[in-house]
From Swiss-Prot:
This is Asparagine--tRNA ligase. It comes from Protochlamydia amoebophila (strain UWE25). GO terms for biological process: asparaginyl-tRNA aminoacylation. One of its GO terms (cellular component) is cytoplasm. InterPro entries: Aa-tRNA-synt_II, aa-tRNA-synth_II, aa-tRNA-synth_II/BPL/LPL, Asn-tRNA-ligase, Asp/Asn-tRNA-synth_IIb, NA-bd_OB-fold, NA-bd_OB_tRNA. Its EC number is 6.1.1.22. The keyword Aminoacyl-tRNA synthetase applies. It catalyses: tRNA(Asn) + L-asparagine + ATP = L-asparaginyl-tRNA(Asn) + AMP + diphosphate + H(+). It is found in: Cytoplasm. It is an enzyme of class 6 (ligase). CDD domains: AsxRS_core, EcAsnRS_like_N. It comes from the Bacteria. Belongs to the class-II aminoacyl-tRNA synthetase family. Keywords: Aminoacyl-tRNA synthetase, ATP-binding, Cytoplasm, Ligase, Nucleotide-binding, Protein biosynthesis. The gene is asnS.
Length: 467
């Protein structure tokens, strides 16, 4: 039975109890150091940031041949006795009695040499980059954030639902969607008027990859009260930035009988919960990021966890920005959407902590957001955090049928495509709210990584769909 390196870390009684016992380790060689009478071999199995040291001596069967074949990237199986290590770098090490090479790795052509590689280069070898310290640590933190997400909502009685990837509606009304079709691209079926005849397509209508599971989530919230989705979403935006992906994951809770204040409370509690979970359960990886990526990372996250989020209206935020003694690249004016530089100024410099902005102009927000009494703003909210800006966006949903019908017209959206969404307002309509959190943005914020393409296993962006 294989023992994972993670279980050999630390000085707990459970770890100390392994001293003197024979175990089997399997992993990939990181370092080989030949001495006169023995060889140090460090392997890593991905369960933890740390490598584990194995000591091989000439009395191991096939020692000379083995040592000649060992190099970075070789996969091995090692059997031996766990002993206390005299070295400062580790508490325990293995005195090997047998080492077997599982898979060879030619050092002449292996792309991951023992040197610092740029993240841009690592993206070009995404099939190998999980073997690096940074991407391995990102992946473990990403896993912890996903687990904490489910734990947070499950503890609060939310039901996890699966919403469709293929959809016939545009949740955001932005039109930047990937189309799904089985029609012949060179010679698609056409109507007598010469238009593409989507009645001949697989689904009998135009269909797309979803931009959000929200509308479907609302259906279940209006029957089961509290639900959440956690799945992939797609945006066909030609954005080549460090903050945008064409394929990313979204966490989207929907709560019946909840207003905007309930929504803000949930978003704040959620963000604090997942950050605390990671700091408590990924200490080694987080210390790595704090040392090598952002030296103020842990203190920044602790500040978010221990601080009550400021709450302010969009209108108040615009006044702050207009009076700010700072030159912005993008103009500030009531009715315009805030840019990342504005959001970061508010969170980092003015408030000095996370802030939730509310009540945005209705013309810059989605059709489904509840119109406020002033008929100029909607019950929307964005959570802004230092170093990132917006990290969560949500709203109270429009539950009034007549208002929703009017808004579909205002946004030039065909009511017949949203007939089911409108019917929710006909039969037992209730106030309800929800938000969306881009999972990769959360990973980026938690790890301090500069580029969002380095916090998802296989990034999809304009011009790139490799691996």
């Amino acid at each position: 039975m294989r023992t994972k390196i993670k279980s050999l870390r630390g000085t707990t009684p459970e770890v100390r109890a392994l001293i003197g016992h024979d175990i089997t380790l399997k992993g990939w060689v990181r370092t080989v150091r030949n001495q006169k009478t023995f060889t140090f071999i460090e392997i890593n199995d991905g369960s933890t940031l740390s490598n584990f040291q194995i000591i091989a001596t000439p009395d191991i069967a096939g020692y000379d041949q083995l040592i000649n074949q060992l190099s970075t990237g070789v996969s091995v199986s090692a059997i031996g006795t766990i002993v206390e290590s005299p070295g400062k770098e580790q508490n325990l090490e293995m005195q090997a009695t047998a080492i077997t090479i599982i898979g060879k790795c030619d050092p002449e052509v292996y792309l991951l040499q023992k040197k610092r590689h740029t993240f841009e280069f690592l993206r070009s070898i995404a099939h190998l980059r999980p073997r690096t310290n940074t991407i391995g640590a990102v992946t473990r933190v990403r896993n912890a954030l996903a687990f904490a997400t489910h734990q947070f909502f499950q503890k609060r009685g939310f039901l996890y639902i699966h919403t469709p990837i293929i959809t016939g509606s545009d949740c955001e009304g932005a039109g930047k969607m990937f189309q799904v079709t089985t029609l012949d691209q060179n010679n698609p079926a056409r109507t007598p008027e010469g238009r593409v005849d989507y009645t001949q397509d697989f689904f009998g209508k135009p269909t797309y990859l979803t931009v959000s599971g929200q509308l479907n989530g609302e259906i279940y919230a209006c029957a089961l009260s509290d639900v959440y989705t956690f799945g992939p979403t797609f945006r066909a935006e030609n954005s080549n930035t460090s903050r945008h992906l064409a394929e990313f994951w979204m966490i989207e809770p929907e709560m019946a009988f909840a207003d905007l204040n309930d929504n803000m409370d949930c978003a704040e509690d959620y963000l604090k919960y997942i950050l605390k979970y990671v700091l408590d359960n990924c200490q080694e990886d987080m210390e790595f990021f704090n040392k090598h990526v952002a030296t103020d990372l842990i203190s920044r996250l602790e500040h978010v966890i221990n601080t009550s989020f400021e709450r302010a209206s969009y209108t108040y935020a615009v006044r702050i920005l207009e009076k700010a003694d700072k030159k912005f690249e993008y103009p500030v004016k009531w009715g315009l959407d805030l840019q990342s530089e504005h959001e970061r100024f508010l969170a980092e410099e003015f408030f000095g902590k996370p802030v939730i902005l509310t009540d945005y102009p209705k013309d810059i927000k989605a059709f489904y957001m509840r119109t406020n009494e002033d008929n100029k703003t909607v019950a929307a909210m964005d959570v802004l955090v230092p170093k990132v800006g917006e990290i969560i966006g949500g709203s109270q949903r429009e539950e009034r049928l007549s208002v929703l019908e009017s808004k579909l017209k205002e946004f030039n959206l065909p009511a017949e495509e949203y007939w089911w969404y409108l019917e929710l307002r006909k039969f037992g309509s209730v106030p309800h709210s929800g938000f969306g959190a881009g999972f990769e943005r959360l990973v980026q914020f938690t790890t301090g990584m500069e580029n969002i393409r380095d916090v998802i296993p296989f990034p999809r962006h304009p011009g790139k769909a490799d691996f």
